[in-house]
Amino acid sequence: MPALRPLLPLLLLLRLTSGAGLLPGLGSHPGVCPNQLSPNLWVDAQSTCERECSRDQDCAAAEKCCINVCGLHSCVAARFPGSPAAPTTAASCEGFVCPQQGSDCDIWDGQPVCRCRDRCEKEPSFTCASDGLTYYNRCYMDAEACLRGLHLHIVPCKHVLSWPPSSPGPPETTARPTPGAAPVPPALYSSPSPQAVQVGGTASLHCDVSGRPPPAVTWEKQSHQRENLIMRPDQMYGNVVVTSIGQLVLYNARPEDAGLYTCTARNAAGLLRADFPLSVVQREPARDAAPSIPAPAECLPDVQACTGPTSPHLVLWHYDPQRGGCMTFPARGCDGAARGFETYEACQQACARGPGDACVLPAVQGPCRGWEPRWAYSPLLQQCHPFVYGGCEGNGNNFHSRESCEDACPVPRTPPCRACRLRSKLALSLCRSDFAIVGRLTEVLEEPEAAGGIARVALEDVLKDDKMGLKFLGTKYLEVTLSGMDWACPCPNMTAGDGPLVIMGEVRDGVAVLDAGSYVRAASEKRVKKILELLEKQACELLNRFQD
């Protein structure tokens, strides 16, 4: 028995060591990280590097502090050996409502959650928002609202100009503009230049922009799909990272990473978009070889279908007539003969004849500091805007005056639409109208040949109805005829916003009718309350007595 005493500490140590894998360490939470059970169990926080932590105590009781793809640690739901990786019943977003503007339901770890939208349509539909910024389209505004936890709504656009339309001031006003001066639209410090990187290499695209206030920068890769992925600063997207200064870094380049990467910079004064071409080649591109003149068919993508094996990872450049420049297309070739160019530069030199249109280039400030006010054309906004030019390394989209810019570039000559004018204010409009409703616009059908159209409205409240019996019939939807509409500048503007509207109009032959002077305004609580007070006090009857 005495001989066993020296062995007791050793046996106790072995016992504790054998159970170390099942019991949590000192201060740690029970369970293991998801990727310790299966490499496929990378969850959201581990792939986007959110919710950073240094130990389990920084996380909730049911979470572990696990390593993420950025080399740091994030809080994620703990897993246990033998537990199912996913719930037995399939989760669903049906009936799950996301109250935050710009968020959509998604399934995460077997539960429905709300995520901010990260893909938007690539078609422009410029939207001025209540935060003073101009967005590429409505989807971009909603995504930004979700990211910042705000509610943004559409407002009428107001174009801010930094200088008067006249020529620049005296020579002594070349000092750097003071912070208290008027807002300045975004401008690049240098023109985007095409880059070529070998497979497995690293590429860096820097959207270095100036502007006042400092512009917000996002990136997206142009594709042939309906929507593009919006890439924001301080985020990782696969092998792409966008840094806090608006620099896009692509690691371990693959052939399918080739394409046009578009930088969007915006502030309260304007919007700028610039394309950065990136080619991914199998070998070091030859610099001395002169490009051969291709056949016209070689510049265009191969549209014929081949029955043989395809090359999904072979991406070539072709000329896109609609865009006026080269873009990437998936390589299609019969018997291995793929048609196209390996780099953007080779495609442009061979297929883009002539110097090109300077008006489609982004505004470039340049690295010098001889500050001068200049004008540049924005193909997105279809108008000329002022910017600060440094004095060197600019491009052709650089004009001394607004007049010379508008003479050189396709500025629409039609005057802007004026604000819709009501025939009378709220009280008088209410008394002169046959109906007053609160509803949401569901559809607008234009009939330009008849100078009219039809608006379908989902009713929320009937405030006044003298001739249609909407409440008695329990009508939920009302079809309103739009009379005398100029669809170039529609009044009343029945397409503005998607919130509830106060709509007042006439009834002709049993049909609700709106004309250019009809009352259509946003249904604010104050406005609806005012209408109810007027109806309760029988203000219209008193007004008719005075008129008689």
UniProtKB/Swiss-Prot annotation:
It comes from the Eukaryota. Residues 186-279 form the Ig-like C2-type domain. Expressed in pancreas, kidney, liver, placenta, and lung. Keywords: Disulfide bond, Glycoprotein, Immunoglobulin domain, Metalloenzyme inhibitor, Metalloprotease inhibitor, Protease inhibitor, Repeat, Secreted, Serine protease inhibitor, Signal. The record marks 122-123 as: Reactive bond. GO terms for biological process: muscle cell development; negative regulation of transforming growth factor beta receptor signaling pathway; roof of mouth development; skeletal system development; transforming growth factor beta receptor signaling pathway. Residues 409-540 form the NTR domain. InterPro entries: Elafin-like_sf, Ig-like_dom, Ig-like_dom_sf, Ig-like_fold, Ig_sub, Ig_sub2, Kazal_dom, Kazal_dom_sf. GO terms for cellular component: extracellular space. GO terms for molecular function: receptor antagonist activity; serine-type endopeptidase inhibitor activity; transforming growth factor beta binding. Residues 299-351, 359-409 form the BPTI/Kunitz inhibitor domain. Residues 108-159 form the Kazal-like domain. Transmembrane segments: none annotated. Residues 164-184 are annotated as: Disordered. It holds the Pfam family Kunitz_BPTI. It is found in: Secreted. The second BPTI/Kunitz inhibitor domain is able to inhibit trypsin. It has however no activity toward chymotrypsin, elastase, plasmin, pancreatic kallikrein, lung tryptase, plasma kallikrein, thrombin, urokinase or tissue plasminogen activator. Belongs to the WFIKKN family. Protease-inhibitor that contains multiple distinct protease inhibitor domains. Probably has serine protease- and metalloprotease-inhibitor activity. This is WAP, Kazal, immunoglobulin, Kunitz and NTR domain-containing protein 1. It comes from Homo sapiens (Human). The lineage of its organism: Eukaryota, Metazoa, Chordata, Craniata, Vertebrata. The gene is WFIKKN1.
